[in-house]
Each structure stands twice: as C-alpha cells, then as structure tokens.
Amino acid sequence: MRLPGEPRSVTRGVGKTGWARLVLRSAAAPQVPSTLGFMNAGPSLSLAEWTVLALISEHPTHGFAISRLTAPGGDLGKIWHIPRPVIYRTIGRLEEAELVAAQAVEPGRGPQRTIYAATPAGRKAAADWLDTPVQHIRDVRSQLLIKLALLDRAGTDPTGLLQRQKIILEPIASAISAERSQHKGFDATLLAWRRATAAAALSFLDDITPSAASRV
C-alpha cells in the first residue's frame, strides 16, 4: 500500500536483476534529442528514491539519519518532505535494485540501525542524475531544487547544470508563447499562466547562475 505523500514508484517488486530491468525501462522512455549531449540513461526512480540514493552516495548512512534531513524542518525536507516510513521502504527498493547495499549495523546501546552504502552502479546513477537538467517546468520547484541542495551539500559548482537547464527550458517557454497566440478564451488564459510560470523559471535560473566574472 502506498503511504500518504509517497511518490509512485516504478521500482516496486524489482528483483536482484532489477538494475538491468531499470536501465532497459528508462532507455525506452522519450528522451531529449541526442544533439543536446547531456542526457544520461539511468534507472527510472521517483524523486524520493533519487533523493535517498544521492544521500547514501554522499557517505554510508542509515534511514534515521536520512529521515532527519527530509523532515519538514530538515535541509531537504523544506523542499520536499519524505516521511520516515517512506524512507525505509525506499531503501528497501534501492537495495533490491542493487543500487545500495547493507554495510554494517551502527554500534551502541540504542536501536540497531543498518548502515547502507551506495554500490558503484548506485553512485554512478546518482552522479548522472544530479548532473542532468529536469525536462519539465513543473519539476523546477521540486527536482531541480533538490538537486541544487544536494550539490551545495557536496560543495559542487552547479553552474554547468544551470546552463544546461536553461537550454532545456528556453524552447519550452518559446513554444508556449507561440501557442498562446493561436487560442482564445480559457485556453488562452491557461497558456498565459504556463507562459508566466516558464518566464519565472527562466528568471530564477538567471538570478542564481553565477556570471563568468564572478567565477574568476
């Protein structure tokens, strides 16, 4: 049963050969034209699964520590809250997909907590995901902000990602503007909203992308 607030996942029931299945499934999904050169094939995971995988890829950790980061007041939870039960279920799915593996049990008198580490395939998948721009304007608020927060935690310069993100969103915004001129009534109203949202997303990217001078 899917818990309240838990994103739908395509990795439920993945067996020990799950990694291969995930790669095949994602390869069949629509992709941005290869001329852009920065789309990375990888497993098809939910945002919760990507977030947990990226955190485990930073260093070996356990579900309780991750749940503190994704709680409403946590570093990532203020962007995208992931309830603690979902964290543990997500770790289980990542383990089944061979993206993480149990490493040890945390010593001490408290509750026994299993420490997980990312597998080589898991680390590569997380790195590729963090380096890939989102494909929809609606994902800027969630996926892109999570990626930027994770890159900041790692001390990684996000400039390249932000520049590639603009390349993805600019033609989308232009297409929306062109389409709006062909409609009337509520359709035009809806497209006006989408155009304003696209413009806001591009303005946001301009605001946070360091200039060439500031990077010298």
Set out the residue ranges of the language-model regions.
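Short, intrinsically disordered or compositionally biased N-terminal tails of bacterial proteins
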Residues: 1-44
